[in-house]
Amino acid sequence: IEWVTKSLEAGKHVLCEKPLGLNAIETAAMFDTAARNGRLLIEAVWGRWHPRFARMVQLVTAGAIGDIEHIETAFTFTSEMTDNYRLNPSMGGGALLDVGCYQAHAWVALTKGAADFSITELARTVGPTGIDLTTDVNVRINNNVTAHAVSSFALPSKQQFIVSGTR
């Protein structure tokens, strides 16, 4: 947060490695600083600019599947990590902050940036360092779209993205 804030206040646009912040308060403070200084702040989530993802967002937001009803996502892999920043809570470790961000970014893109999330169900498996090895979450987006996301360092490899609509 310190270097992002200093860079924004120095008039720089910032592309920050994920996770952007460790919690909503830190993240909001950085976005407030960006807005006050007229600077762009982006979390470095590579999938957001992938041509396949951009095309999916274009088709869905143009109504190709009607109104979005449900989004089903998974980003999971098994790992033998023992000494890695992903296991350190003070460095933004955990499956949710490491790979769950891809799913949340997709929800925002598909809802044209107006995503209001409400968690309806949450389950997680916590590892020995206190980080989540697996997080399984159900959410309601903008009160009309349901979504389910699984993020994990402990489940077999799966990268899935399914969007269901009224058509």
PLM features: what roles do these ranges have?
Residues 2, 25, 51, 129-130, ...:
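Residues that form or flank phosphate/diphosphate-binding pockets in enzymes
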Residues 2-48, 63:
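Beta-strand-loop-alpha-helix segment that lines the small-molecule cofactor/substrate pocket
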Residues 8, 67, 131-133:
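Residue-level preference for beta-strand/loop junctions
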